[in-house]
């Protein structure tokens, strides 16, 4: 069969990897590189060039079984990373990093702050009582309402939980307050974030994340068209017509592996179900800068973490998410030059130290979007179209792989139905 795949993020690449074994595929990619959020930059510096990741960075073997199985199949090596989280608040001067008592109290006056001790108490209570909400499968309360209902303190909310969750999902404070609380707790539970100790080890791809993307696409690289955005998609009873700058091309089936909002915009003939499901899952744009300006890190070196959340205004967490990833810590670069990746806080970065500037889009999670995720099967198959992407679950690499495997399963089932 002739099959089109739109997008070379993790979902599109996994779908194409498997489809290429038995079908004639054409992969359309709007960017000038393969990978989507898998984005590695080769930076010349002291000690030789460094492959610095700016999108997908870390994974673990406990909660990424499909992705790590794929890495093993491809022979891609991983290296141990150091995962830690810290907060810097310009309004209050607060700085801490949560990996040890020394770093938790990197700012020694935190020992005398009742609000800081209250935050620690709330962290322990939140972790201890999470099971109650997890056991209530029908509870759709938002995170903001849940925190208010349970009486958590402002320090815990604005200096710990919302910054951590906002950093995980690249979402601003207002969006995080609308996040389904049980959905967040399920993710935290799965990733060991409700425990102070015994959390899973995290890893990065040795040589940068592009190494796995290159291995995954090696067999079908000649079928990938870079800088070729799809302009429109029209479905007919016996074929799918994909329009790009090259004109109209006809295929027997289509795998749509771009974002949900992009997918819906491409369809000339969306069904009511496609409108309802894809339209319920929105995205937020984030500006991302790769740079060497270490002034974005906490002022105290003891408080430097792998993930550093920057609170510039404590008034309901005003402004977009602002987090700096220290890539020396995450990717193990042994050099004096600090390589950082910062979301959104571009005005604070010395422009002379900027290496690259990107925009990535991330899913927005609400009770409505989570409900729509449960309807993936309703739109996978009709009109010869199959949807995959990390947005069908939590938005991470494992989710992209699982969504592609789900779409492939629907595809195989549809072929069996047509043959009967």
Task: Identify the residue ranges that each predicted region occupies.
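Glycine-rich FAD pyrophosphate-binding loop
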Residues: 20-44
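Conserved flavin/dinucleotide-binding core of flavoenzymes
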Residues: 99, 316-420
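N-terminal Rossmann-like FAD-binding beta1-loop-alpha1 element of flavoenzymes
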Residues: 2-27
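Mobile amphipathic helical/loop "lid" adjacent to a hydrophobic cofactor/ligand pocket
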Residues: 61-181
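Conserved Rossmann-like nucleotide-cofactor binding loop
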Residues: 11, 33, 261
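N-terminal glycine-rich dinucleotide-binding loop that anchors FAD/FMN and/or NAD(P) in oxidoreductases
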Residues: 41-67
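Mid-domain catalytic core of redox enzymes
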Residues: 228-361
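Helical element adjacent to the flavin cofactor pocket in flavoenzyme catalytic cores
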Residues: 184-244, 249
């Amino acid at each position: 069969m002739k099959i089109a795949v739109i997008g070379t993020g993790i979902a599109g690449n996994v779908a194409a990897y498997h489809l290429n074994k038995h079908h004639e595929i054409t992969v359309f990619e709007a960017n000038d590189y393969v990978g989507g959020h898998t984005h590695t930059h080769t930076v010349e510096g002291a000690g030789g060039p460094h492959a610095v990741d700016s999108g997908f960075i870390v994974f673990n073997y406990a909660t990424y079984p499909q992705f790590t199985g794929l890495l093993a199949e491809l022979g891609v090596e991983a290296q141990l990373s150091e995962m830690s989280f810290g907060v810097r608040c310009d309004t209050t001067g607060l700085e801490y990093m949560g990996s040890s008592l020394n770093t938790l109290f990197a700012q020694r006056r935190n020992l005398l702050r009742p609000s800081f001790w209250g935050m620690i108490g709330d962290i322990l209570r939140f972790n201890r009582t999470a099971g109650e909400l997890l056991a209530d499968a029908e509870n759709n309360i938002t995170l903001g309402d849940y925190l208010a209902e349970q009486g958590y303190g402002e320090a815990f909310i604005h200096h710990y939980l919302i910054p951590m969750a906002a950093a995980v999902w690249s979402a601003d404070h207002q969006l995080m307050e609308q996040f389904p609380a049980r959905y967040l707790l399920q993710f935290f539970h799965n990733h060991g974030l409700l425990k102070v100790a015994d959390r899973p080890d995290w890893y990065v791809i040795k040589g940068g994340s592009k190494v796995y993307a290159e291995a995954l696409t090696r067999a079908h690289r000649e079928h990938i068209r870079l800088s070729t955005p799809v302009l429109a998609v029209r479905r007919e009873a016996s074929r799918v017509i994909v329009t790009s700058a090259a004109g109209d091309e006809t295929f027997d089936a289509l795998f749509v592996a771009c974002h949900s909002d992009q997918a819906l915009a491409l369809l000339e003939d969306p069904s009511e179900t496609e409108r309802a499901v894809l339209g319920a899952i929105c995205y937020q744009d984030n500006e991302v800068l790769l740079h060497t300006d270490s002034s974005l890190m906490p002022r105290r070196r003891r408080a430097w973490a792998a993930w550093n959340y920057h609170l510039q205004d404590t008034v309901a967490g005003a402004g977009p998410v602002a987090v700096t990833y220290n890539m020396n810590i995450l990717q193990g670069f042994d050099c004096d030059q600090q390589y950082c990746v910062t979301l959104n806080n571009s005005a604070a970065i010395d422009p002379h130290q900027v290496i690259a500037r990107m925009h990535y889009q991330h899913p927005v999670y609400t009770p409505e979007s989570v409900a729509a995720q449960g309807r993936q099967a309703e739109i996978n198959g009709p009109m010869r179209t199959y949807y995959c992407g990390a947005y069908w679950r939590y938005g991470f690499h494992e989710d992209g792989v699982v969504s592609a495997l789900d779409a492939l399963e629907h595809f195989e089932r549809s072929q069996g139905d047509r043959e009967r």
